[in-house]
From Swiss-Prot:
Catalyzes the interconversion of 2-phosphoglycerate and 3-phosphoglycerate. The keyword Isomerase applies. Keywords: Gluconeogenesis, Glycolysis, Isomerase. The active site is at H9 (tele-phosphohistidine intermediate), E87 (proton donor/acceptor). It catalyses: (2R)-2-phosphoglycerate = (2R)-3-phosphoglycerate. NCBIfam families: pgm_1, PRK14115.1. Its EC number is 5.4.2.11. Substrate binds at residues 8-15, 21-22, 60, 87-90, 98, 114-115, 183-184. One of its GO terms (molecular function) is phosphoglycerate mutase activity. Disulfide bonds: none annotated. Belongs to the phosphoglycerate mutase family. BPG-dependent PGAM subfamily. PANTHER family: PHOSPHOGLYCERATE MUTASE. This is 2,3-bisphosphoglycerate-dependent phosphoglycerate mutase.
Length: 245
């Protein structure tokens, strides 16, 4: 049996402010730092170890991973960064307060932008200061490949591509893998692994910085999955609450 650990970054400053974040490089909040330390302690207490780690090029996921590995005394573990593990790009919504956006466009429209599979939010324009195609972290991306907005389907496509090209070979070679990423990125991977329908993924929420364990067979098909707490495996359907850490 193969185990894969997925973890969404700890609470970010814009999570705290209830703003659309997307590809904006926002750091962790004080609470998010605590959540990351807690996650590392949970994994260590439950006897987990890792040979390789994967994350995005956004600091909230990177820092979460650093803290988790530090708490586990695994700072030597190789880390691979890729924009393909970035959060979904929220286009022109990035930086906007979610409640204020709902007042402007209506709750239903914002819900469609956030939760539908194939509807993209309004796109950025290339003259928008939030457009970052020239940022060095995206030097491997051609200008016409850089997204101006994304739907969940777009996100799933790049995540699954990275899964097959980079992560699957690691798992098949026997390496113990952790992925530190983002809410919609993990939703996309879970949708793919569990073969969820579009309706099934709409209500799927990934909590911040709670280790999610997938047990996979030799063909990397899911056997089962569960969240971890200080006391071990959490019963199916339950999500553990954070403790003060």
């Amino acid at each position: 049996m193969i185990k894969l650990v997925l973890i969404r970054h700890g609470q970010s400053l814009w999570n705290l402010e209830n703003r659309f974040t997307g590809w904006t490089d926002v750091d962790l909040s004080k609470n998010g730092l605590s959540e990351a330390r807690e996650a590392g302690t949970i994994l260590k207490k439950n006897g987990y170890t890792f040979d390789v780690a994967y994350t995005s090029v956004l600091k909230r996921a990177i820092r979460t991973l650093w803290i988790v590995l530090h708490e586990m005394d695994l700072t030597w573990v190789p880390i691979h960064n890729s924009w393909k593990l970035n959060e979904r790009h929220y286009g022109a919504l990035q930086g906007l307060n979610k409640d204020e956006t709902a007042k402007k466009y209506g709750d239903e429209q914002v819900h469609i932008w956030r939760r539908s599979i194939d509807v993209r939010p309004p796109a950025l324009t290339e003259d928008d200061p939030r457009y970052e195609a020239n940022n060095p972290r995206y030097k491997t991306l051609k200008k016409d490949e850089f997204p101006l907005t994304e739907c969940l389907e777009d996100t799933e496509k790049r995540v699954v591509d990275y899964w097959h090209s980079e992560i699957v070979p690691s798992l098949k070679s026997g390496e113990k893998v952790i992925i530190s990423s983002h809410g919609n990125t993990i939703r996309s991977l879970v949708k793919y692994l569990d073969n969820l329908s579009s309706d099934g993924v709409v209500s799927l929420n990934i909590p911040t910085s709670i280790p999610l364990v997938y047990e996979l067979d030799e063909k990397l098909r899911p056997i089962r999955h569960y969240y971890l707490s200080m006391d071990g495996e959490v019963p199916e359907g339950e999500i553990p609450k954070h403790i003060s850490f």
